[in-house]
From Swiss-Prot:
UniProt subunit comment: Homodimer.
Domain (Glutamine amidotransferase type-2) ranges: 2-219
Protein name, per record: Glutamine--fructose-6-phosphate aminotransferase [isomerizing]
GO molecular function: carbohydrate derivative binding; glutamine-fructose-6-phosphate transaminase (isomerizing) activity
Keyword Ligase listed: no
GO cellular component terms, A-Z: cytoplasm
Taxonomy, superkingdom: Archaea
GO BP terms: carbohydrate metabolic process; fructose 6-phosphate metabolic process; protein N-linked glycosylation; UDP-N-acetylglucosamine metabolic process
Active-site positions on this chain: C2, K597
Location of the SIS domain: 280-420, 453-592
The reaction(s) this protein catalyses: D-fructose 6-phosphate + L-glutamine = D-glucosamine 6-phosphate + L-glutamate
Function: Catalyzes the first step in hexosamine metabolism, converting fructose-6P into glucosamine-6P using glutamine as a nitrogen source.
Amino acid sequence: MCGIIGYIGDRKACEVIVKGLKRLEYRGYDSAGVVTGNGETLDVRKGAGRIDKLTEKLGFLEMEGNRGIGHTRWATHGVPNDINAHPQKDCTGKIVLVHNGIIENFAELKEELLKKGHVFRSDTDTEVIAHLIEEELKGSENFEEALRKALNKLRGSFALAIVYADEPDKLYVVRNESPLVLGIGEGEMFAASDVPAFLEYTNKVIFLDDGEYAILTKDSYVVKRIDTGEVVEKPVHEISWTLEMAEKAGYPHFMLKEIYEQPRAIKDAIHGNREIIRSVAEEIANYDKIIFVAMGTSYHAALVGKSLFQRLAKKVPIVEEASEFRYEFEDLIDDKTLVIAITQSGETADTLAAMKLAKKNGAKVLAVVNVVGSMATRIADLTLYTHAGPEIGVAATKTYTTQLTVLTMLAIELAKVLGTASEDYLEKLEDELMKVPELVELALKHDEALRELAETLKDKRDFFYIGRGISVPTALEGALKLKEISYIHAEGLSAGELKHGPLALLEDGVPVVAINPSGKVFDKMVSNIEEAKARGAMIISLSDREELSRVSDVLVKMPEVDELLSPIVYVVPLQLLAYHLAVLRGNDPDKPRNLAKSVTVE
C-alpha cells in the first residue's frame, strides 16, 4: 500500500516525481504530496484526492528544484485529509519525509516528544519520525547519525524517503519490512516503492533489504546497516522488462490488457522454469510435511497447488492463510517442514512474516514469486519465478494463471521424481500444458459474449460461484474477482456445500456460475446445478460438455482440457465477466476502492 518516489539529479524533480506517482497509482491511495528544493527552502505541497486533480490544484509541476520526494498515502493512522497527507515535517520544517508502513510504538514516542516541546500538526505516525530525527539531531554530530539513532528507536514497518534542508545535495532512503528499490542512473539517482516509477529513466536497480538505509547524491550511493552503520555492498540488477510492457498499449484498462497477455505470460512461465524445475523438485521430494502459505488470489493458487500435489505426487499438503499461519503453526514447524510461499509482489507483509517464522524454526522455504529481487526471494531457500511481467491492475489476472502454471510444472516434476504417477500420463500432461496458451486464446474469444451477458447481470445484487474438486479454487477466485472490482456481493464455494446452508439464499434470478469441466466430479456437479436450478437460480455454466446446456440458462463452451489443467483455462472467462461488470457499473477496474495491489502492512 502507498507509494514512494524520490529523485536527485539534474532534471526538474517535480516532473520525475509526478510521473512516478502516476505509475504507482495501482498501489492504492487516498492522498498525495510532493516536496522539492535544492537549498534551505523546501517547498511542500500535499492534499487528499487523486494525483491529476492535486497536480492542477496545487501546481505540482510548477515546483522548483532538482531533488525531491513524492508520496501516495493509504490512511492507517489519521483520516485521509490535507493535513495527514505526506510529506510530513519536523518543527523547524527542515526535515521532510514520506513513509510507507506502520510505526507500532508511535504513541509512546509521540508522548515523549510532546513532553520535550514538539508541536504536532497531524494525526499520523509518520510525523513522529520527523520530530524524532529533529530531537536526535540535538545530540548528534551530523544528520546521518541522528537518523540512525531515530531509526533504531522505531518498531514496526517503514520505508522512508527523507530530505534535509541543510544537506541540499543528498537524499536519504530507508527500508524495514516495506519495499524500496533504488534506481541507478547516469548523473541521477532514484528511489521508489516499485520499479515502474522510474523505469523510463533507468533499468539498473538495487533492492534494499530490511534494516538498511541509503544515502544518494546525483553521482553516488552508499548503502548501510541501520543497526551498525556498516557499509553493505549491494549487487546491481538489470530489469529485463520495459516501460512499454507496463503501459496500456491501446487497451482501455490495464486489467483487460493483462487478461489478454495471459497466453504469452503462460508461455514465459513454462520456458522460464524448464531448466530449474527438476532441481527444485528433487530438493523438496523428501518432505512430507508441506504447508502452502499465501493471501488473496495467491491463496487460491495454493489451493490448486494442494490438489495437484495430492493427485500427482501423492503428497497431502496443508494450505493456510499467511496471516493466520504464525498463530496456528508456530510450534509445529521444524526442519522436516517445507513451506511454499506464494506471493505476486514478493512483498506481501503477512506472507513475509510467515516465511521468516518458518526459516526461524528451521523449515525449508520455497517462494513462488513474480517480482525478481523482491524480499520473498531473499528470505527463501529456493525460488520459482512466474515470469508474468509487470501487473499494474490491482486485481490479479496473469499473475494468477502463471502461478498455476508453475505449480503444475512443479507437481508434474515431483511426481516424476517420486514415481507416483504413470510416465505416459505425465508426458501427456506436459504436452497438454504446452498447449494451454492456445486454449486460453480460445477462452478469450468469449469476450464479446461475456460483455453482452454482463449487460443482463449488472444490476444483480448477489452471485454464487460453485465447483468441485480442483475447480473449487476457481469458484473462489471468480467470486473474488467479481466483488473486488464490481462491488457486487459474491460467494465462492464447493457445490457440495450448497445444501448445507447457501441454498437458502437462492431465489428466482440469482446468478449461479458453475465451473464444470469433464472429469471425475462432472456428474456430481450436474446434480448440484439441478438443485440450484430448481430454486429458480439463473445458471451460467462453464464446461466443455454440450449436454450441460440442458440445465443451464447460459453455457460458456470451453475447450477440452485435462481436468488438472482446467483451472488455468477456466478462470479466464470469469476474469472477463468481472471486468465487464465493473466497467458497466461505472467502476475503474484498475483501481478498486479500498484495495491496494501489494499489501505491505499486516
